[in-house]
Amino acid sequence: MGKITFYEDRGFQGRCYECSSDHVNLQSYFSRCNSIRVDSGCWMIYERPNYSGYQYYLRRGEYPDYQDWMGFNDSIKSCRIIPYSGSHKMRLYEREDYKGQMMELTDDCSCVQDRFHLNEIHSLNVLDGCWILYEMPNYRGRQFLLRPGEYRRYLDWGAMNAKVGSLRRVIDVY
């Protein structure tokens, strides 16, 4: 089980809300979020209710300012704990509906372009474990949580285009 604490003000100040499970709508607990402390587990926090809007991946640690989790603003309206899996495996496809060249991945990939000579992935199948997809290399840019399942096109994981820069396994190493 995980534990995350949201604070309205920077530096862990102001009204706070402690959470240990998924929340589809956090609006009644705080109006803004400027700092977060993750005591245990890995979490995905979302800019809007219903797990929508910008997504941010957080591991155990302290985030005294929303820019520390690469946030664009102080709006956090839903959160989800990410289940831990000991093994990770996914298949990436260069075209929609699992067509074109297929590549298999079992570890982190800091640059999809360097490793597979592609910068667009149009479909993927997560066979084991949870992953974070980043639109830019070196784990930067917009983030998307990938849970086990099929993603026939980039819209299925919430992206506006097929640009994939890097991929990271969700591992709670602490």
Curated annotation (Swiss-Prot):
One of its GO terms (molecular function) is structural constituent of eye lens. Residues 84-87 are annotated as: Connecting peptide. Residues 2-40, 41-83, 88-128, 129-171 form the Beta/gamma crystallin 'Greek key' domain. Pfam families: Crystall. SMART domains: XTALbg. It comes from the Eukaryota. Disulfide bonds: none annotated. SUPFAM superfamilies: gamma-Crystallin-like. One of its GO terms (biological process) is lens development in camera-type eye. InterPro entries: Beta/Gamma-Crystallin, Beta/gamma_crystallin, G_crystallin-like. Keywords: Eye lens protein, Repeat, Sensory transduction. Monomer. Has a two-domain beta-structure, folded into four very similar Greek key motifs. Crystallins are the dominant structural components of the vertebrate eye lens. Belongs to the beta/gamma-crystallin family. This is Gamma-crystallin D. The gene is CRYGD.
